[in-house]
Amino acid sequence: GVDSELVFDETRSKANLYATIGTTDSPGVMLSGHTDVVPVDGQDWHTDPFSLVSRDGCFYARGSADMKGFIACVLAQVPEMTRRSLRTSAHIALSYDEEVGCLGVRRLIELMTTLPVQPMMAVIGEPTGMQVVRAHKGKQAFRVTVRGRSSHSAYPTEGVNAVDTASGLVAYIRQLQQNIRVHGPFDDAYTVPNTTLHVGTIQGGTALNIVPEKCVLEFEIRHLPEQDVDRLVADIRGHIATVLEPPMQAVDPDTGIEIEVLTSYPGLSTQTDAAVVGLVQSLLGDTEGTQKISFGSEAGIFTGELGIPAVVCGPGSIQQAHRADEYVSEEQLDRCIRFMSKLTDSLVDGIAFP
């Protein structure tokens, strides 16, 4: 049978699912994915993005690669898992709102902390071309609100220009990025071998002849797992407090800068000799070694919060995710289905955990 529980959000309009096939009082292997997808607004799709279309050996739809293909392969294996007697349990963890900051998984973590035993390892099925990924970067995202004072643009010294102040912060973030690009730290196993800082949005001002009273920008840091990201954030906060705010508040003490954390999740760095790495590689017949990726996943959260060793491995390519005509190939799904079948055999035989 399947022992399952739904963990709803505050509105009860969406939920996480945690299910166990086998016994709930012994450690097992967790298969995890997120059920939400990114919007299709403004994208030039050639098929209905919310109707699955099979063409030329590929399946087209929003979320086909990221990451409903993996979830479909997992669910397709459930009848076989329930039919056979598993010596090692299988756990299925499906989350909501991963795409907007890994929000749903936090509630799932709360449930899992109450379980009698934790999974001994986890496979998160983000699209990796069925390659074994043992490490990924972490991410912190922020919204900065600059509160200035408006005035007629003919008398700019009577106001505090919020856009001008925000541009100073953008310049400082760019300076930090340039310093990291030159001095590191580096890890050449990543496509982008260093921590990156990126200003993605900025809005400010109401008219050309008005000194802008408000400016809002958003930036992110995608950091190597081993890098002290808190120090980077402290540098930015320190620059705001010591360089940017004093001249503003000399004109008007009610002006200032607020910084809000939008998203924060840790990086993943699973050792090459971890049991989960060896198991997944052996089931795939993988002799090419492991990978590291610059995008993030919930794997880092499961490891960081619960201590569950994890890898990322799933069908499809991240290059197809989040764009028009997203697809996953039939060949990739076949590889994932074969992996699930071999995993089931291993669960029936029993997996010896170190």
Predicted features and spans:
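Acidic/His- and Gly-rich active-site-bordering loop/insert found
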Residues: G1-Y60, R83-L86, G307, S317
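Hydrophobic/aromatic beta-strand patches that form the interior of the parallel beta-sheet core
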Residues: E5, V29-L31, A93, V123, ...
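Acidic-glycine-rich active-site phosphate/pyrophosphate-binding loop
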Residues: V40-S54, P119, R134-T145, L279, ...
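Fold-level recognition of mixed alpha/beta catalytic cores in primary-metabolism enzymes, strongest
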Residues: D56-F59, S64-A65, G69-Q175, P193, ...
